[in-house]
Design a protein with these regions (language model features):
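Glycan-recognition and catalytic cores of secretory/periplasmic carbohydrate-active enzymes
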Residues: 1-213
Length: 213
């Protein structure tokens, strides 16, 4: 954790996926899942420092890692000396500006969990907004199991890796992203109004039925 960036570094120094940029302090959206351990550490030790780090990371991630529509960037690279954001990119998604499905799932679960642990309204808002992005996306299949990236193969999204649509008979799905999101929604529905909660619950059940079929 760095007080200058306000978040936890995910990897040591490395080159970006396309090899064009240097990542000095890369932070991935996946880190939202790991904050639960820090909240637990504060509970069992009585030391609030761990939870404070988790809160700082979640707040910084909400500010720097999300787009206006509440989709997120997989990787944000910071300058470790100044805390300034240098790059917003991907390492596993279709393109830098696309919505990698598992990354969206990490966010929904992560902010739902952060709200459970803190009851901070801004975390509940993030959980709902990221959930709404997922549930309302025009490219979410009827069975609720997403394509591996919501924007894979779409116009305006250019991958900087050797992608050839002919290699795939159809766009692959991401069952793990579906399971993560279903788990998050089964908790999130308890924290919102009854009407919204019912929609989240039904979406989770539909997702699980698809995964189990």
């Amino acid at each position: 954790f760095s007080p200058k960036t306000g978040c936890i570094k995910s990897w040591n120094y490395r080159k970006s996926w396309n090899g064009k940029d240097e990542w000095f302090y890369p932070v991935i959206i996946d880190n939202m899942m790991n904050l639960e351990l820090l909240y637990f550490a504060s509970k069992v030790t009585g030391d609030p420092h761990y939870a404070e780090i988790a809160n700082s990371h979640a707040i910084t991630t909400a500010r720097e890692q999300f787009r206006e529509d509440y989709s997120n960037y997989h990787v944000v690279n910071y300058d470790p000396e100044t805390g300034k954001v240098l790059h917003k990119q991907t390492c596993q998604g279709f393109s830098d500006n696309s919505a990698w499905a598992r990354g969206q799932a990490w966010a929904i679960y992560g902010y739902t969990m952060a709200y459970r642990e803190t009851k901070k309204p801004e975390f509940l808002e993030m959980a709902q907004r990221t959930a709404e992005f997922w549930l309302n996306h025009s490219n979410l299949p009827e069975d609720m199991v997403p394509y591996w990236d919501f924007n894979a193969g779409q116009e305006g999204y250019v991958p900087e890796w050797e992608y050839d649509a002919n290699d795939f008979k159809e766009i692959p799905r991401d069952a793990s992203a579906a399971a993560i999101t279903a788990s998050a929604l089964l908790e999130l529905y308890q924290y919102v109004d009854k009407k919204t909660g019912k929609r989240y619950y039904q979406a989770a059940v539909k997702t699980l039925k698809s995964l189990a079929s």
